[in-house]
């Protein structure tokens, strides 16, 4: 999981999820796209 200042969808399978005041991008098709804002 990459930690980035701004998270963006990188493909059509990515989903933006908010958990515990953090923003995540989760992608089951391509796990390289997983990101966390921090």
UniProtKB/Swiss-Prot annotation:
Q: Give a GO biological-process term.
A: translation
**InterPro entries documented for this protein:** Ribosomal_bL36, Ribosomal_bL36_sp
The domain of life is: Bacteria
Stored PROSITE patterns: RIBOSOMAL_L36 (PS00828)
What Pfam family is a match, any one? Ribosomal_L36
- What Gene Ontology molecular function terms does this protein carry? structural constituent of ribosome
Q: Which UniProt keywords apply?
A: Ribonucleoprotein, Ribosomal protein
NCBIfam families membership: rpmJ_bact
Q: Which family does it belong to?
A: Belongs to the bacterial ribosomal protein bL36 family.
Task: Supply the name of the protein.
Answer: Large ribosomal subunit protein bL36
Q: Which organism is it from?
A: Thermotoga maritima (strain ATCC 43589 / DSM 3109 / JCM 10099 / NBRC 100826 / MSB8)
**Gene for this protein?**
rpmJ
